[in-house]
Amino acid sequence: MIRGGALTHVALGLTVFLLLAVVHSQEKCSKTCIAQKCNVLGIRYGKYCGIGYFGCPGEPPCDDLDDCCMTHDNCVDLKGMTYVDCHKQFQRCVNELKQSIQESNNQKVGFSKECPYSTVIPTVYRGMNYGIFFSGIGNIIIPKKPASAGPVVEVDLARSKADTKDGLGTNQGPQTKDGSKVSVPMNPSPS
């Protein structure tokens, strides 16, 4: 159980995280590769790396790390800030980059000499750990909506030679209507 002081810290941290995430919609997009505050959570790296910092649509990333950040930004734009898989996908991308750097005998250093990968990668990785933590809290506070019944497909089997014994691959028996027409739910409940 979380006690008073710890709960205050969690609430404050979540508030700061969400406020910084809102900044994303209020700032202008970047067309320039920059490297600022490379060893703190307020980092701005490339065109896409940093909380509330993002590149303009169609702008190419500055390097491989910026590409990971661009992919993360696109995922979060589609799925939402609390979608943890976006953050985990980012960490996998960064881990692959770290492996590539090791294989190059540390010859890969990124676009910035002032902020080499050796400084920037731990910073963005640490920031993403916070993102995963706060996304988990956000998902507890704002639970996901239950899934609605999915669409139903209706097929006239008189025209095909489909085997309907197992519900057309859905593991649900088809519901026969009007002779040879059947309907099967597209999002069957797990069996």
From Swiss-Prot:
Specifically expressed in flowers but at a low level. Detected specifically in the pollen. It catalyses: a 1,2-diacyl-sn-glycero-3-phosphocholine + H2O = a 1-acyl-sn-glycero-3-phosphocholine + a fatty acid + H(+). GO terms for cellular component: endoplasmic reticulum; extracellular region. The keyword Endoplasmic reticulum applies. Binds 1 Ca(2+) ion per subunit. One of its GO terms (molecular function) is metal ion binding. It is found in: Secreted; Endoplasmic reticulum. Disulfide bonds join 29-56, 33-62, 38-115, 49-69, 68-93, 75-86. Ca(2+) binds at residues 48, 50, 53, 73. Residues 1-25 form the signal peptide. The keyword Cell wall biogenesis/degradation does not apply. The active site is at 72. Its cofactor is Ca(2+). Belongs to the phospholipase A2 family. PA2 catalyzes the calcium-dependent hydrolysis of the 2-acyl groups in 3-sn-phosphoglycerides. Releases lysophospholipids (LPLs) and free fatty acids (FFAs) from membrane phospholipids in response to hormones and other external stimuli. Plays a role in pollen development and germination and tube growth. The enzyme has a slight preference for phosphatidylethanolamine over phosphatidylcholine. This is Phospholipase A2-delta. It comes from Arabidopsis thaliana (Mouse-ear cress). The lineage of its organism: Eukaryota, Viridiplantae, Streptophyta, Embryophyta, Tracheophyta.
